[in-house]
């Protein structure tokens, strides 16, 4: 990789600190989201609170791809169990995003100069997807941090040819891949961006990373039903495409500069932005796998490119500089309401806390409860007290006892018998717009409710319907 543009180079600390502090402030702003929790975070919470033997047994059947993250959360809750559970759940992501923003600034500093790096870190911290996952109790922000850190080490390894730095790169990438195996796509992007002189070493290191990932990949391939919910490209792709187009436009602008001036960034950043997402999209005709959070680290590539263009514009004089300042101000005005919206319960697919409150208000001791579909039992994992006194009419074994995410259910005939022996049932369902599951258990739930019960009332909360059904005349 060629040298970055030559110029005054402030201390690295001065470059990294402002983006890191900005990211930390944004991450702490509204981090509790009004006490709301959505279903993926509920899974994280439940898995983190299982015993280590139960957790290990569950990972053998489901969610092995997130196993290391659940183990991390298990340790944190063991140490800080008396603290606010939402903070314990989300602070790792807040801190990881702050570290990623600061590290990205250092990476940009090496690739394009100090101011370009600082601006890249600030842009990264402000991107809506980055703000979103900075406040989620899932692994994606931590994976993003590790990929950004590995990218920094990769640039240093190429510059110094140090085996120790190459080993550090390999170790960090292995950690990222063990937290989420799609981080391995960043290795492909890194290989693509390497200069020819470093590719042989890069290939050897990539082989080590893939070898360490292989056991997890084999296990998770046997759990492919975990991603069966991905129905194809949709809204996720629209948002990611907008960021990608912005980044690629910036890359084109940067390539207009002579090589000695533009530095290595226009060759490095587009690969990180485009390749991982493109490789996921290639699988769509056979098995849809693209979800924007799986390649959240690609936004680091976009931020590097935008930061470099902003730096280039600020070096210019007259109209170009004025346009850059106005465009930046307009972008900040647009991002403010987006940021506010991300910190509301309505920003997520559902609200487990609101569901629990609605169930507690609707149910009475002795009532039955049905989850339609069965995986919506996740809504009761965090607050089992909301269904205490209610009889789960379909349940065979609970999530922890069955070493599954949502528990196992009795056969359809057993569900029918239990429903017919119950006078009043609280039903937890998806919104009307969601497709219906076609399993025998789900079909019999719908048929018995339609034939033998009447709907007494329905309360709608974010991402869910809580209905009360009773025998005719018993509402």
Language-model regions, residue ranges each:
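Terminal, non-globular segments
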Residues: 2-475
